[in-house]
């Protein structure tokens, strides 16, 4: 048709590329994978638990942050720091929850991997900052390797929990099935089948291997 100018090739191409990238970005944020949902965080309880606007409690999969005693206003080392970092990441924001095989814990909390709008995983961010350690629990192990890599990054950098590390001495025994480690003197170790026993000379070695401290006999951090 006369009187109309065609856009030049490069200009049309640049505009098309920009629109294409914009659409891809919008798709990545709005598309919700199977087993995932968009939620808004109302309150942060501690370093690994939040309350959603709909009232549900969410416990982050694959990590364990230092405990906070809300009644006494006390906490394990780095407990308040973990809560502050968690709050800075998620409080009041709309995020994406990704579920695994087991969706609720024994307390009725939703078990989830939590993703920020930019795609970063909050579980992973807290490990990278040294404000939590890996807590591998079957069958929810989809990102086990990725989370362990994040913990090792923090350990190498001596970040957070790993900053002023000291070893009290002694030996430790891990359970291949539960991925927990115990003081060698703990009676619980007698229940571990020989084929499932893993010996560690230090707590550092146990954490580096992806084992978490058992609540029995408290090998701790």
Predicted regions and their residues:
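Small beta-barrel nucleic-acid-binding modules, primarily SNase/OB-fold domains
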Residues: 2-221
């Amino acid at each position: 048709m006369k009187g109309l100018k065609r856009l030049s090739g490069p200009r049309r191409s640049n505009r098309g590329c920009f629109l294409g990238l914009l659409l891809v970005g919008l798709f990545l944020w709005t598309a919700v994978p199977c087993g995932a949902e968009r939620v808004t965080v109302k309150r942060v309880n501690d370093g690994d638990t939040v309350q959603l606007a709909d009232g549900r409690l969410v416990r982050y999969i694959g990590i364990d942050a230092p405990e906070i005693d809300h009644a006494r206003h006390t906490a394990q080392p780095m407990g308040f720091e973990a809560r502050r970092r968690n709050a800075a990441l998620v409080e009041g924001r709309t995020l994406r929850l990704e579920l695994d095989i087991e969706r609720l814990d024994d307390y009725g909390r939703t078990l989830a991997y939590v993703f920020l709008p930019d795609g970063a995983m909050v579980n992973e961010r807290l490990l990278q900052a040294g404000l939590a350690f890996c807590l591998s629990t079957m069958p929810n192990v989809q990102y086990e390797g990725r989370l362990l890599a994040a913990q090792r990054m923090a350990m190498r950098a001596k970040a957070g929990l790993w900053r002023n590390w000291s070893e009290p001495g002694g030996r430790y025994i891990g359970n291949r099935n539960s991925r927990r480690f115990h003081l060698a003197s703990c009676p619980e170790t007698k229940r571990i089948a020989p084929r499932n026993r893993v010996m560690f000379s230090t707590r550092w070695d146990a954490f580096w291997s992806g084992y978490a401290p058992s609540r029995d006999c408290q090998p701790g951090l």
